[in-house]
Design a protein with these regions (language model features):
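Multi-pass alpha-helical transmembrane bundles in non-GPCR membrane proteins
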Residues: 2-170
Length: 170
């Protein structure tokens, strides 16, 4: 015990906490060349889109690390759980952002991006303020967001190389 902190009582899920911390660190590391390359392009849409994507990725892993690490009080656990689940919406929308702005662009890209972020914001509001929100509601929203790309699948396939499309599916 150090200063009243005992591992038995304070660490909630060390396995998940460690793997998500590793994910956060790796996301930060791989984001560096991505952001540098976007700045070198001089394309502000590319820069902003990739910053949004990397922040959403690091944010999700950071929130998840915090949620799975700390077992301080039921109130804090509940807040961290809400943040962790809300960040899933942010990551999905953040992942769409470069595809919609860089790959698609135009009315289709920005229209799809608007729909995705509206659903993400609604999902965040549900997670944060609708205390009794059934799990199926957020699950349906996650799945709907994931499948919305179908409306633009032909232009996405046409615009990406086979390798890039493979990475998108991964």
């Amino acid at each position: 015990m150090i200063g009243g902190f005992t591992m038995k009582h304070k660490l909630k899920d060390p396995g998940s906490a460690i793997t998500h911390l590793i994910g956060m660190i790796l996301a930060a590391i791989v984001s560096i060349p991505l952001i540098i390359k976007s700045f070198l392009s001089g394309d502000y849409v590319r820069i902003i889109s990739l910053i949004i994507f990397t922040i959403s990725m690091i944010g999700l892993y950071g929130a998840s690390t915090a949620y799975h690490s700390f077992n301080i009080s039921p109130m804090i656990n509940k807040k961290l759980k809400k943040l962790d689940h809300a960040m899933i919406f942010v990551l999905i929308a953040g992942s769409y952002t470069p595809i919609c702005t860089i790959v698609l662009g135009g009315t289709l890209g920005y229209g799809l991006l608007s729909v995705i972020w509206i659903i993400a914001i609604l999902g965040i509001v549900f997670k944060m303020f609708w205390v009794t929100c059934p799990k199926w509601v957020s699950s349906v929203m996650y799945i709907a967001m994931g499948w919305l790309c179908i409306v633009a699948i032909a232009p996405i396939i046409h615009s990406l190389s086979k390798t890039s499309f493979g990475w998108l599916l991964a």
